[in-house]
């Protein structure tokens, strides 16, 4: 099942639990606007290249739409639509005043030079500048994009609308980015894990972890969990997978990786088959890479007691059912990986106020938002006698539905 079908399925289940009428249900599912633009740029060798860019603005009942822009060869309208819808529910679960959006350009960023990426970003911004804005739609980095991409968008947008730092989040600190933003998703994963384990009388300290993905989210999650006394016993990325039953030395591994080393070449670990990573014995499994990695083929062999969805849609619905029968507790993506969008909200607030926070305040506020969201999800689980995924979906959908009704948009 693709990401759009799975997200829509979860939404419909939540709508049924909430007893939404069919007209309201349909209006919540339909995107506010879908944008498709062609971006033609001169390449460094003088030839012209064309790329298709997308922006799906899903819902703005609770505030400006919010969502990342990804550069990836497999960006397509279905995927962007699913992720935009997911952002609507995610921002509502987090109780931040945003709706959902998502965008992307179908390209292979690794095959483009820095100057080509800049030209592509500026052309894309020129095509959508009148449809985004601090109080309309606020983009952020995603797969294949970063703070430099956001700096180019900010600059290009400002040529049309004047200096507007709040138009994007995930910017460089020197252009109004927030302290703590780089670590935010990984730190939020740690806070979410801490909250879930506490419910079961456990803690990060003394628990064993397997992490799939060692990019921004995975590396920060591993580092912060290690600092909290958790034992990361296996870890993998596109270069390979490694394990150490006594716990990997995460600071040493980070140093090795930052010096250009591949995971499989790390001295203090045993190389393992990557296909074994997700089914490795552990207390907590944290998928931080692509969607759909847990499926009906490998779900029966999963040995983790808890799964924290740091990636978007890492668990197929079929795997969800298998894991539930096995008694595995899954903390869903629309809550578990919301640390990034929460700190993006803090960045937006700081830009609008023109008053920057120190990192301690950012982390303290993030902790508060993650804890509050978890308690609200648990309350919905109790009210509707459902699992954590449906607890999160009913919480998010209910908040958006209430805002829609209050604004008189249901007709």
From Swiss-Prot:
SMART domains: ELFV_dehydrog (SM00839). Residues 1-18 form a transit peptide. Its EC number is 1.4.1.3. The active site is at 102. Induction: Slightly induced by NH(4)Cl and NH(4)NO(3). Induced in shoots after nitrogen (N-deprivation) deprivation. In roots, first transiently repressed but later induced by N-deprivation. Induced by alkali stress. Up-regulated by salt stress in old leaves. Activated by IDD10 in the presence of NH(4)+ ions. Induced by cold stress (i.e. 10 degrees Celsius). InterPro entries: Aminoacid_DH-like_N_sf, Glu/Leu/Phe/Val/Trp_DH, Glu/Leu/Phe/Val/Trp_DH_C, Glu/Leu/Phe/Val/Trp_DH_dimer, Glu_DH, NAD(P)-bd_dom_sf, NAD_bind_Glu_DH. GO terms for molecular function: glutamate dehydrogenase (NAD+) activity; glutamate dehydrogenase (NADP+) activity. GO terms for biological process: cellular response to nitrogen starvation; glutamate catabolic process; response to alkaline pH; response to cold; response to nitrogen compound; response to salt stress. It catalyses: L-glutamate + NAD(+) + H2O = 2-oxoglutarate + NH4(+) + NADH + H(+); L-glutamate + NADP(+) + H2O = 2-oxoglutarate + NH4(+) + NADPH + H(+). It comes from the Eukaryota. It holds the Pfam family ELFV_dehydrog. It is an enzyme of class 1 (oxidoreductase). It is found in: Mitochondrion. One of its GO terms (cellular component) is mitochondrion. Keywords: Mitochondrion, NAD, NADP, Oxidoreductase, Transit peptide. Expressed in roots. Expressed ubiquitously in various tissues. Belongs to the Glu/Leu/Phe/Val dehydrogenases family. This is Glutamate dehydrogenase 2, mitochondrial. It comes from Oryza sativa subsp. japonica (Rice). The lineage of its organism: Eukaryota, Viridiplantae, Streptophyta, Embryophyta, Tracheophyta.
């Amino acid at each position: 099942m693709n990401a759009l079908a799975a997200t829509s399925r979860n939404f419909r289940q939540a709508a049924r639990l909430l007893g939404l009428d069919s007209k309201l249900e349909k209006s919540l599912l339909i995107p506010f606007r879908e944008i498709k633009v062609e971006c033609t740029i001169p390449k460094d060798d003088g030839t012209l290249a064309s790329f298709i860019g997308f922006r799906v603005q899903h819902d703005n009942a609770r505030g400006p739409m919010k969502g990342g822009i990804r550069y990836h060869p497999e960006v397509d309208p279905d995927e962007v639509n699913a992720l935009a819808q997911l952002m609507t529910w995610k921002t509502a679960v987090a109780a931040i005043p945003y709706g959902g959006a998502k965008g992307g350009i179908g390209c292979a960023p690794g095959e483009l030079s820095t100057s080509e990426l800049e030209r592509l970003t500026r052309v894309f911004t020129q095509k959508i500048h009148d449809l985004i804005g601090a109080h309309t739609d606020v983009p952020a980095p995603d797969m294949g994009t970063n703070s430099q991409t956001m700096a180019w968008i900010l600059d290009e947008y400002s040529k049309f609308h004047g200096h507007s730092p709040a138009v994007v989040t995930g910017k460089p600190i020197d252009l109004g980015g927030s302290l703590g933003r780089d670590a935010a998703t990984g730190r939020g994963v740690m806070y979410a894990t801490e909250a879930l384990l506490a419910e079961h009388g456990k803690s990060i300290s003394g628990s064993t972890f397997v992490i799939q993905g060692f990019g921004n989210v995975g590396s920060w999650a591993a580092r912060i969990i290690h600092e909290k006394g958790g034992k990361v016993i296996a870890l993998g990325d596109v270069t390979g997978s490694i394990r150490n039953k006594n716990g990997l030395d995460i600071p040493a591994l980070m140093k090795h990786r930052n010096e250009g080393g591949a995971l499989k070449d790390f001295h203090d670990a045993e190389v393992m088959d990557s296909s074994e990573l997700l089914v490795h014995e552990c207390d907590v499994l944290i998928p931080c890479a692509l969607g759909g990695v847990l499926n009906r083929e490998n779900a029966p062999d999963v040995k983790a007691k808890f799964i924290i969805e740091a990636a978007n849609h890492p668990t197929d619905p079929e795997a969800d059912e298998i894991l539930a029968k096995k008694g595995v507790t899954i903390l869903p993506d629309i809550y578990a990986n919301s640390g990034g969008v929460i700190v993006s909200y803090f960045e937006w607030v700081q830009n609008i106020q023109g008053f920057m926070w120190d990192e301690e305040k950012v982390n303290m506020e993030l902790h508060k938002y993650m804890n509050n969201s978890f308690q609200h999800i648990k309350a919905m689980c109790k009210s509707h006698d459902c699992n954590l995924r449906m607890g999160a979906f009913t919480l998010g959908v209910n908040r958006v539905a209430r805002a829609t009704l209050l604004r008189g948009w249901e007709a």
